[in-house]
């Protein structure tokens, strides 16, 4: 690793907390509006698809469709919350408000900033995903214990999609480019990864492809927990999510370094 790259890596194990705290203090002023905005879409989908389509579909994989869907919506909510926090809020702090430039005049490195942004986005995903789980538990489609047990996977899902989105904002010149990521990456994952309907209904080639996507690993961990079943290949899914979180993190640091040096 060259000295230039090493100099932008996280300086230590705790500097990132300053970035997290800064974002939390700013978010606290608009917390209610932020939470409602993050929850409106997944809750609408949960009730609309769950009760509407559920009457037609009936039972799926041994459970009611709305219980099946609720677990998928927890994963989707974690994905979208972390993604949009990174795409829009982190991009604004980096490119529009130039907050990152000001922070770099302190003892924090670029790696500290990126790590703090990732953990902050994951924190918001925990709030969003857990809130959907609470709705499901309140309606009797999940147990309170299962929702608590799903929180670590929700947090890891948030880290994964924040890390992937961080690569996107390191390359995107403006907000306009985010629509390509949303349309070509996020939306297909929602429908291919088993969140809305079982992947067993798809052709084998699609199943193999979907199994490589990060949301599929998240769904395959969250759904068994919320339905109080054993998760198959849990270690494989956790390992895959860790790879999806770590590799884009290091890639984004290198890309941000090149961008800021222009």
Swiss-Prot record:
Bilayer topology annotation: Multi-pass membrane protein
Span of domain ABC transmembrane type-2: 33-259
One Gene Ontology CC term in the entry: ATP-binding cassette (ABC) transporter complex
GO molecular function term, any single one: ABC-type transporter activity
Keyword Cell membrane belongs to the record: yes
Subcellular location(s) per record: Cell inner membrane
Membrane spanning stretches: 37-57, 64-84, 102-122, 125-145, 149-169, 177-197, 236-256
InterPro entries xrefs: ABC2_TM (IPR013525), ABC2_TM_bact-type (IPR047817), ABC_2_transport (IPR000412), ABC_transptNodJ (IPR005981), Nod_factor_ABC_transporter (IPR051784)
Principal subcellular localisation of the protein: membrane
GO biological process: oligosaccharide transport
Entry keyword set: Cell inner membrane, Cell membrane, Membrane, Nodulation, Transmembrane, Transmembrane helix, Transport
General function of this protein: Part of the ABC transporter complex NodIJ involved in the export of the nodulation factors (Nod factors), the bacterial signal molecules that induce symbiosis and subsequent nodulation induction. Nod factors are LCO (lipo-chitin oligosaccharide), a modified beta-1,4-linked N-acetylglucosamine oligosaccharide. This subunit encodes the transporter.
Family: Belongs to the ABC-2 integral membrane protein family. Lipooligosaccharide exporter (TC 3.A.1.102) subfamily.
Subunit: The complex is composed of two ATP-binding proteins (NodI) and two transmembrane proteins (NodJ).
Name listed for the protein in its UniProt record: Nodulation protein J
Upper lineage: Bacteria, Pseudomonadati, Pseudomonadota, Alphaproteobacteria, Hyphomicrobiales
Gene that encodes it: nodJ
């Amino acid at each position: 690793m060259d000295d230039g790259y090493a100099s932008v890596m996280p300086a230590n194990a705790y500097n990132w907390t300053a970035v997290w705290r800064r974002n939390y203090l700013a978010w606290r002023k608009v917390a209610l509006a932020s939470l409602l905005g993050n929850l409106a879409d997944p809750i609408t989908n949960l009730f609309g698809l769950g009760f509407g389509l559920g009457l037609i579909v009936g039972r799926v994989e041994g459970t009611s469709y709305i219980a099946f869907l609720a677990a998928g919506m927890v994963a989707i909510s974690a994905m979208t919350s972390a993604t949009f926090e990174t795409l829009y809020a982190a991009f604004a702090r980096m490119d529009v408000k130039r907050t990152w430039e000001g922070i770099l005049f302190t003892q924090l490195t670029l790696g500290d900033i990126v790590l703090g942004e990732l953990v902050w986005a994951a924190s918001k995903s925990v709030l969003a995903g857990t809130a959907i789980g609470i709705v499901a538990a309140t309606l009797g489609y999940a147990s309170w214990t299962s929702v608590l047990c799903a929180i670590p996977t929700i947090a890891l899902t948030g880290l994964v999609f924040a890390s992937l989105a961080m690569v996107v904002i390191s390359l995107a010149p403006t907000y306009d480019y985010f629509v390509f990521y949303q349309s070509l990456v996020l939306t297909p994952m929602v429908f291919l990864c088993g969140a809305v309907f079982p992947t067993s209904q798809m052709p084998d080639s699609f199943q193999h492809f979907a199994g490589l996507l990060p949301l599929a690993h998240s769904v395959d961990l969250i759904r068994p927990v919320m339905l109080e079943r054993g998760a198959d290949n849990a270690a494989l899914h956790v390992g895959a999510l860790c790879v999806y979180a770590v590799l884009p993190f290091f890639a984004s640091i290198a890309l941000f370094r090149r961008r800021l040096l222009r």
